[in-house]
Amino acid sequence: MGGCVGAQHDSSGSLNENSEGTGVALGRNQPLKKEKPKWKSDYPMTDGQLRSKRDEFWDTAPAFEGRKEIWDALKAAAHAFESNDHELAQAIIDGANITLPHGALTECYDELGNRYQLPVYCLAPPINMIEEKSDIETLDIPEPPPNSGYECQLRLRLSTGKDLKLVVRSTDTVFHMKRRLHAAEGVEPGSQRWFFSGRPLTDKMKFEELKIPKDYVVQVIVSQPVQNPTPVEN
């Protein structure tokens, strides 16, 4: 990524200047700016969808490049930044020897020169946020007629790392499939967020409308640990 990122800090706290012509301003380490990025989502987004998008990023980003401990530090710094605790965010960044050439978490470098880019949706909510649908509306989803449609298997990959095949019916809604997963694995429907081809699936969508190819894996982000009932020991 260019040796300038791995250069020693001088007494002013800035990286030594280097002019290798990389086209990236790596010469300076600026303090984290307090201004939050303003952005608009491609579609109106609920708080739950925003959390799902963030969970998906943090679950997958360390697998592609960079060091896990730096990703962990950036996640903690991003949370502190959004919570307006700028001193904590800056302390986390400094403690992990992370360089911010532009004073923003959207472009960061570790001391080995690895580059890390945080999407704006991990730093601030969009300007077109909408209210979450109420639980009452979810309860209004009608039950499909017994034995309607046809039975099929759906491959799921949970964010806990578990893969499984779930028996569903073609007339099931996503909400009813969540209930089936709850019965099989103990994951509350409200703690599940389903994704197909990177698109969040809403509770009212029907399986037959999703056109999921055979053996295609549907991602399920679990927002709490799976709770398996265990006997109480006296």
UniProtKB/Swiss-Prot annotation:
Instruction: Cite the SUPFAM superfamilies for this sequence.
Output: Ubiquitin-like
Q: Polar residues bias: where?
A: 9-21
CDD domains attached to this UniProt entry: Ubl_UBTD2
Give positions of region: Disordered: 1-46
Q: Tissue specificity, please?
A: Detected in dendritic cells. Highly expressed in tumor cell lines, but not detectable in most tissues.
Comp. bias (Basic and acidic residues): 32-41
**Pfam families named in the record:** UBD (PF16455), ubiquitin (PF00240)
Compartment list: Cytoplasm
Alphabetized, the UniProt keywords read: Cytoplasm
GO CC annotations, alphabetized: cytoplasm
Q: Which residues form the Ubiquitin-like domain?
A: 152-227
Q: Which InterPro entries match?
A: DC-UbP/UBTD2_N, DC-UbP/UBTD2_N_sf, Ubiquitin-like_dom, Ubiquitin-like_domsf, UBTD1/2
- PROSITE patterns, per the entry: UBIQUITIN_2
* Coiled-coil boundaries: none
What's the main place this protein lives? cytoplasm
> Know the name of this protein?
Ubiquitin domain-containing protein 2
